[in-house]
Amino acid sequence: MTGNVISADGAIALGLDFGSDSVRVLAVDCQHGTEIDTEVVYYPRWKKGLYCQAAQNQFRHHPLDYIEAMEQAIRQMVKRLSEEQRQHIVGIGVDSTGSTPAPIDEQGQVLALRPDFADNPNAMFVLWKDHTAIEEAEEINRLCRSGEFADYSRYIGGVYSSEWFWAKILHVTRADVAVREAAVSWIELCDWVPALLSGTTAPQDIQRGRCSAGHKSLWHPSWGGLPPRAFLAALDTSLVNDLDYPMFTDTYTAERPVGQITAEWAERLGLPTTVILSGGAFDCHMGAVGAGAQPYTLVKVIGTSTCDILIADDQRVGDRAIAGICGQVEGSVLPGWIGMEAGQSAFGDMYAWFSNLLSWPLHQAALTQPEWQPQLKQIESNLLASLTRAWAQNPSLDHLPVVLDWFNGRRTPNANQRLKGVITDLNLGTDAPTLFGGFIAATAFGARAIMECFEQQDIPIDNVLALGGIARKSPVIMQVCADVMNRPLQIVASDQCCALGAAIFAAVAAGAHDDVPTAQRHMACNIERTLIPDPVQVVRYQQLYQRYQQWCHTAEPHYAPVTKVIH
């Protein structure tokens, strides 16, 4: 916390949640945890599909999307507050997707904000789900396992992903000479926003978050921070010759203040100049805090993908490296505890893919009959809900297709972004609701595989929490997860836990609470309901899960990289 101690009574903290499609701002009462108001604004360029090529797995965000959406969201929400409430805003916390890094120049400006790079996707933020760096990730993994160096992937699950910091930097550096020559460093989105608002974007002034550095950047205290110069140079000399080395050494947990909002940003956002910026972290880590997570509770943040967070104590973990996950980092969730991350690369995105597939005739009809567009759009928007209801009325598992949930690769266990979705066991009687039931089961099977990855390595899971829009709005899907995992599944009573977690850290940084656990007791959200496994369905899903595992073992070798034959 800061040196200033303020009363939580009446104090308001803002949480900024930068998602894949939009930014959300949430105003929270620091004393009682009341969610006072919220606003969501979509990214305008992203909404138009600019700078993205889905077929090449390229997904980029222009920094102006973040700036414009954030400014609009905060200003619109602040206008609805009373003047007294506005003056009682004490802090802003920030979470974002990750790894979502961007190149910056000597002044700390993201390159795409410069006229010479304004429309260059390589000068923008490389979104978490961008998989253009698969080959670079494999290079990093080979070097980690070569024996030439220590295994710097040891504490990130043993597999470095194409979704992460160094793989993306390496890919862009090689693909774009102009970006390579202009960039002196790279920054994660969750670190950039607090730096932007506090005027600390110069590379030497940036406060790097423990969460992003430990989970995605190979930072670990046992080797003094980032991997040594020789390791990065062995990947590509540009990583140490063209970029600052070390890019950073120290990292900070998110309750530490980054600085005070600048006068310019206070005026632009309609906020007091006394507002404190807390450190940034990834959305799901802050979501776990907002959900009130306790040690050995698996928190599933469910959206387009999932991120699974678990907190463990150092005594139980010791010096063990937990294999197959996305990292174990002290302080990445709660200070003093080891935060562990896992996840599924596609959850809601799988359902959306299926909906888009079935909607093709609707789109064609809308082109030929424009006057039908309103009705066709309504049918499309209700499609997933209709499929879910139809399957729930007759959830037969006798002929359920077995689907592998690798439509966007696999994050956990053992990250592998080369993998593709697989649909098996179709017959002439398979209809759309039944196939959608296979998709629901697939996402639940992926969730169970993550749970077993922890438990098989003596990391117990005492409780399972689910949060996010799907968790609250889709009881059928959540019941399948409870049945497949054979665990009670607690549903958190908020769609805004990530923003709430960010607000909790802001409250601590501003001095409204002494520490994060105290702030959680006052501000974290409650459990809305608990789903209990159905013993009959548990047995039936167990048989399907075994088939799922068999298909996983059969299918994965087919996606191994092809060895190039040199003649």
Swiss-Prot record:
NCBIfam families associated with the record: L-ribulokinase (TIGR01234), PRK04123.1 (NF003154)
Annotated organism of origin: Yersinia pestis bv. Antiqua (strain Antiqua)
Pathway involvement of the protein, from the record: Carbohydrate degradation; L-arabinose degradation via L-ribulose; D-xylulose 5-phosphate from L-arabinose (bacterial route): step 2/3
Record Gene3D superfamilies: 1.20.58.2240, 3.30.420.40
Annotated GO MF terms: ATP binding; D-ribulokinase activity; ribulokinase activity
GO terms of biological process kind: L-arabinose catabolic process to xylulose 5-phosphate
Protein name: Ribulokinase
Catalysed conversion reaction: D-ribulose + ATP = D-ribulose 5-phosphate + ADP + H(+); L-ribulose + ATP = L-ribulose 5-phosphate + ADP + H(+)
Similarity field: Belongs to the ribulokinase family.
InterPro entries tied to this protein: ATPase_NBD, FGGY_C, Ribulokinase
Keywords: Arabinose catabolism, ATP-binding, Carbohydrate metabolism, Kinase, Nucleotide-binding, Transferase
Record EC number: 2.7.1.16
Source species taxonomy: Bacteria, Pseudomonadati, Pseudomonadota, Gammaproteobacteria, Enterobacterales
GO cellular component: a single term: cytoplasm
Recorded superkingdom: Bacteria
Signal sequence, start to end: none
